[in-house]
Amino acid sequence: MKFSSVTAITLATVATVATAKKGEHDFTTTLTLSSDGSLTTTTSTHTTHKYGKFNKTSKSKTPNHTGTHKYGKFNKTSKSKTPNHTGTHKYGKFNKTSKSKTPNHTGTHKYGKFNKTSKSKTPNHTGTHKYGKFNKTSKSKTPNHTGTHKYGKFNKTKHDTTTYGPGEKARKNNAAPGPSNFNSIKLFGVTAGSAAVAGALLLL
């Protein structure tokens, strides 16, 4: 009895293992190594798990004929690295060509730190610096054709005046009236004689 039950249990166990082994080998897996080094796994059976943990065939393993990973961490080919036919990097850190560095045909840097040519330094054809610190020519220094300085501290032009000493003044006051004084009395129609007659009549 015991022998037969042990035998039955053993046979059942062997049958279960055999069924499991048969179920394991009920599918076919093909590994294909392509010329570019990519490995393709193909599973052909209805008993495989299509989506999930053991799905070994995915679209991410299809051969990439460009030789580069198109999207992702190792994408080494981008639009920013297309050849630039101008010979310079157009946009970015090393852009050494800018509009501010176009050749200036005047020979001077037009705008910026080293602009040494300004409108205030245009040639002055009068021979003097017109406006600024060293302007030595002013309207007050225009030539005066009278020969004297017309306005200012050193006006040496005096009116026609004669200076007399004390003796000369007394002599001039006691002198007889000159022709100029006589002419001034004539202007009023009065002579010396008529003046004396008029004075005598007033005393009577």
Curated annotation (Swiss-Prot):
The GPI-anchor is attached to the protein in the endoplasmic reticulum and serves to target the protein to the cell surface. There, the glucosamine-inositol phospholipid moiety is cleaved off and the GPI-modified mannoprotein is covalently attached via its lipidless GPI glycan remnant to the 1,6-beta-glucan of the outer cell wall layer. Its main location: secreted. Belongs to the PGA14 family. Residues 175-204 form a propeptide. Residues 47-59, 67-79, 87-99, 107-119, 127-139, 147-156 have a biased composition (Basic residues). Residues 35-179 are annotated as: Disordered. It is a lipid-anchor; GPI-anchor. This is Hydrophilin YNL190W. Disruption phenotype: Has statistically significant lower desiccation tolerance capacity. GO terms for cellular component: extracellular region; fungal-type cell wall; side of membrane. The keyword Magnesium does not apply. It is found in: Secreted, Cell wall; Membrane. Induction: Up-regulated in response to osmotic stress. A lipid is attached at N174 (GPI-anchor amidated asparagine). It comes from Saccharomyces cerevisiae (strain ATCC 204508 / S288c) (Baker's yeast).
